[in-house]
Amino acid sequence: MLDLLCPVCGGRLAREKTVWRCESRHSFDVARSGYVNLLPPSASGKRHGDDKRMVAARTAFLSRGYYDHLIGAVAGSCAQLTGPDACVLDAGCGEGTYTRAIYDALAAKGGCPQLLGADISAEAVRRAARQGAGGVFFAVAAASLT
């Protein structure tokens, strides 16, 4: 699996049942729906990325099939360019539509892919985790907030 880094100290995070923790003991709880929020504590309470209404609108639009050809092309390219046991990061995964399609395309090759979907929007990641697939893990994360 992809290594996750602590947003506080930069140390490697390890999963311990329902929490991700670094060697410096900074910890990040895994939500009931299965995702982890890795935004730094200084970002707590602030809204980042899409809100619930925006995520719902995007999900409704994508469910109408307008982008199915593009989603299929992206997933197919990933399957073609990687092995069936690939470890893939979907940075800016939104509500997980592309992430799940990539997972399905890789799994169809008979492998056991591992995908990490990351987005700065907690609402989008919540929805992605609720609709997730095996082998897909979602995190609220950002490379930098400055």
Label every PLM stretch briefly.
Residues 1-48:
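N-terminal auxiliary segments of SAM/dcSAM-dependent transferases
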Residues 51-73:
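Class I SAM-dependent methyltransferase Rossmann-like catalytic core
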Residues 85-94:
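Conserved class I S-adenosyl-L-methionine
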Residues 95-110:
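Conserved SAM-binding loop of SAM-dependent methyltransferases across substrates and taxa
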Residues 114-119:
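Conserved SAM-binding motif I beta-strand of class I
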Residues 121-123:
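Conserved SAM/SAH-binding beta-strand->alpha-helix loop
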Residues 128-129:
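Conserved SAM-binding loop
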Residues 133-144:
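Conserved SAM-binding strand-loop segment of SAM-dependent methyltransferases
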